[in-house]
């Protein structure tokens, strides 16, 4: 008897992903905004529709679109079949019953300043954070540092204050902050983690825009943490991005394309535009003009029209 050949399920090969989207320069048209809102899950659409400020709504929406783009294009799951959930700590994750060929698939997003960013790995625990260097809202930089004194170790403060000008000190402050947040987000502990348990030995001190650096080391509870690596980038003059990655225990997935350290250093951020975000999008809800009307009443639209009081 001749048995029919088994049909093989082709699992796509996946490498790590690093994406960024400039929320600050995105001034959405009515058609863009309504399409974007139709392309996310209803509960997320309702949540984003309640934001007071346009900048926050844009950043949150860009983050959701990046996640769905990632899952649709890298895992070959149709856009309208993707189901995202949140952990008890609020971290977005792919629903456990999704047809995911990578059981340890991990992604993380961050948005701050003018960008939303995403990092993803097929088999590696990952966390990402972005920080924009900006002057404190109130008080001087030394006063700001005094308030934040307990967030860093003595050695970290020595590194931060080793520069002559205060702006560069602030730059280094936010670089350290992004590193700590990337690790905390990677391990998924949320608020309450004592930041002084983490000490970063940053290297190099000066970073070029667009390059990726992996020399920085983590000291955790007084001991060097060798299971974690940190990728650092400057997307532009004012935005630092840190990505924390950890190889999981157990065997690697046979279809995962791993790279050695020399190649990992080339894992630069790809800057996406709006058309990139929705290239694979499938609208899931009817168009609702009220979401555009709400968006038009937020602060940023008033600023754009020059009518802010």
Curated annotation (Swiss-Prot):
Q: Alphabetically list the UniProt keywords.
A: Cytoplasm, Magnesium, Metal-binding, Transferase
Binding annotation for CoA: 47, 86-91, 108-111, 181-185
Location of the protein in the cell: Cytoplasm, Cytosol
Q: Does the keyword Nucleotidyltransferase apply?
A: no
**Which cofactor(s) are needed, names only?**
Mg(2+)
Which SUPFAM superfamilies does the entry mention?
Answer: 4'-phosphopantetheinyl transferase
Coiled coil spans: none
Reaction catalysed by this enzyme: apo-[ACP] + CoA = holo-[ACP] + adenosine 3',5'-bisphosphate + H(+); apo-[ACP] + acetyl-CoA = acetyl-[ACP] + adenosine 3',5'-bisphosphate + H(+)
Question: Got a GO cellular component term for this one?
Answer: cytosol
Query: Which residues participate in Mg(2+) binding?
Result: 129, 181
Query: What is one GO biological process annotated to this record?
Result: 10-formyltetrahydrofolate catabolic process
Subunit: Monomer.
Query: What does this gene product do?
Result: Catalyzes the post-translational modification of target proteins by phosphopantetheine. Can transfer the 4'-phosphopantetheine moiety from coenzyme A, regardless of whether the CoA is presented in the free thiol form or as an acetyl thioester, to a serine residue of a broad range of acceptors including the acyl carrier domain of FASN.
> By what name is this protein known?
L-aminoadipate-semialdehyde dehydrogenase-phosphopantetheinyl transferase
Source organism (scientific name):
Mus musculus (Mouse)
């Amino acid at each position: 008897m001749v048995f029919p050949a088994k049909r093989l399920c082709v699992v796509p090969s996946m490498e790590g992903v690093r994406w960024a989207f400039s929320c600050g320069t995105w001034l959405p048209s009515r058609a863009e905004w309504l399409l974007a809102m139709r392309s996310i899950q209803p509960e997320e659409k309702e949540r984003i529709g309640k934001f007071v400020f346009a900048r926050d709504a844009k950043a949150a929406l860009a983050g959701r679109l990046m996640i769905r783009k990632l899952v649709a294009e890298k895992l070959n799951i149709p856009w309208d079949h993707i189901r995202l959930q949140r952990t008890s700590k609020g971290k977005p994750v792919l629903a456990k019953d999704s047809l995911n060929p990578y059981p340890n698939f991990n992604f993380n997003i961050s948005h701050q300043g003018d960008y939303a960013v995403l990092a993803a790995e097929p088999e590696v625990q990952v966390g990402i954070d972005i920080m924009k260097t900006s002057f404190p809202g109130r008080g001087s930089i030394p006063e700001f540092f005094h308030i934040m004194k307990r967030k860093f170790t003595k050695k970290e403060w020595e590194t931060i204050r080793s520069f002559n000008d205060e702006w560069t000190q602030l730059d280094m402050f936010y670089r350290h902050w992004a590193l700590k947040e990337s690790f905390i987000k990677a391990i998924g502990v949320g608020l309450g983690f004592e930041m002084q348990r983490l000490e970063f030995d940053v290297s190099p001190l000066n970073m070029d825009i667009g390059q990726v650096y992996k020399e920085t080391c983590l000291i955790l509870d007084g001991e060097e943490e060798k299971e974690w690596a940190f990728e650092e980038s400057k997307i532009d003059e004012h935005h630092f991005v840190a990505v924390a990655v950890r190889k999981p225990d157990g065997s690697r997935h046979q279809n995962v394309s791993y790279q050695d350290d020399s190649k990992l250093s080339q894992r630069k951020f790809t800057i996406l535009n709006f058309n990139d975000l929705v290239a694979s999008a499938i609208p899931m809800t009817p168009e609702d003009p009220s979401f555009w009307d709400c968006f038009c009443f937020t602060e940023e639209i008033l600023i754009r029209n020059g009518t802010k009081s």
